[in-house]
């Protein structure tokens, strides 16, 4: 967040800090029903490989109890993958601030994974969960929408038990010469058009593209993760830097 503590980025605009969450909620309420379809269209299906890479890094236990908190995971995409990869004692709590996204997730879950998944309404900056209650915390393509990222990271640290792991999958900054220009042209010209055509909402997808550009560089975000108390902080760039997996451990 910028030095001005009363305002923050909303895409390329500056808005009062206390207004951002409401605006973000409206974006995701608008796109919830088409969210996963749009992810396929926007990424050409690559988001599936990126999420698989996140689950491979997570490695949920197949032989012992494993408790995962997936934040901003309303539609259940990460949760379902983790449950399929883990053992019978893997349990996922999906937390999202947006009721429309949670409704999609509950509908998709149906009767699958009975007793192994729950959906909770909550704010990443003030998790309604006890200290040290999870083995791992994941957040995929969500942390850039949080008004106070440092608070979300502090909350992630709080709810993890010692030895727990923080994993964040987020869009990043393309580092391949030539690809950066192609990616920018695609992002700013094509994605909002797809949003208008498929989801009936050009402006929400324009915000999502702009929010990617405002997100910190991998090095800067690593510094924020370390400031929250995490150790052994690393990141791995995917697809030429289009996105990255960030990792940190709670040692004590």
Curated annotation (Swiss-Prot):
Gene: ubiE
Protein name in the entry: Ubiquinone/menaquinone biosynthesis C-methyltransferase UbiE
NCBIfam families: MenG_MenH_UbiE, PRK00216.1-3
One of the Pfam families matching this protein, by short name: Ubie_methyltran
Enzyme Commission code: 2.1.1.163, 2.1.1.201
GO molecular function, one term: demethylmenaquinone methyltransferase activity
Keywords of the record: Menaquinone biosynthesis, Methyltransferase, S-adenosyl-L-methionine, Transferase, Ubiquinone biosynthesis
CDD domains registered for this protein in UniProt: AdoMet_MTases
Record organism: Methylobacterium nodulans (strain LMG 21967 / CNCM I-2342 / ORS 2060)
Catalytic activity: a 2-demethylmenaquinol + S-adenosyl-L-methionine = a menaquinol + S-adenosyl-L-homocysteine + H(+); a 2-methoxy-6-(all-trans-polyprenyl)benzene-1,4-diol + S-adenosyl-L-methionine = a 5-methoxy-2-methyl-3-(all-trans-polyprenyl)benzene-1,4-diol + S-adenosyl-L-homocysteine + H(+)
InterPro entries named in the record: SAM-dependent_MTases_sf, UbiE/COQ5_MeTrFase, UbiE/COQ5_MeTrFase_CS
């Amino acid at each position: 967040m910028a030095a001005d503590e009363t305002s923050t980025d909303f895409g390329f605009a500056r808005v009062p800090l206390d207004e951002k969450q409401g605006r973000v909620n409206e974006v995701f309420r608008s796109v919830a029903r088409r969210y996963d379809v749009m992810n396929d269209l926007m990424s050409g299906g690559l988001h599936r490989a990126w999420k698989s890479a996140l689950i491979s890094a997570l490695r949920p236990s197949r032989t012992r109890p494993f408790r995962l908190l997936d934040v901003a995971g309303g539609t259940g995409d990460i949760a379902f993958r983790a449950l399929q990869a883990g053992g019978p004692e893997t349990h996922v709590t999906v937390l999202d601030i947006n009721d429309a996204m949670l409704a999609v997730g509950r509908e998709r879950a149906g009767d699958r994974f009975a007793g192994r998944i729950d959906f909770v309404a909550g704010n990443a900056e003030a998790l309604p969960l006890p200290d040290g209650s999870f083995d791992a915390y994941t957040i995929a393509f969500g942390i850039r929408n949080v008004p106070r990222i440092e608070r979300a990271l502090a909350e992630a640290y709080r709810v993890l038990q010692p030895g727990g792991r923080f994993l964040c999958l987020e869009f990043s900054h393309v580092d391949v010469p030539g690809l950066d220009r192609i990616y920018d042209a695609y992002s700013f010209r094509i994605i909002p058009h797809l949003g208008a055509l498929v989801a009936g909402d050009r402006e929400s997808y324009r915000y999502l593209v702009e929010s990617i550009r405002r997100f910190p560089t991998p090095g800067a975000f690593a510094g924020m993760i370390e400031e929250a108390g995490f150790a052994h902080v690393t990141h791995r760039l995917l697809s030429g830097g289009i996105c990255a997996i960030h990792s940190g451990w709670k040692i004590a």
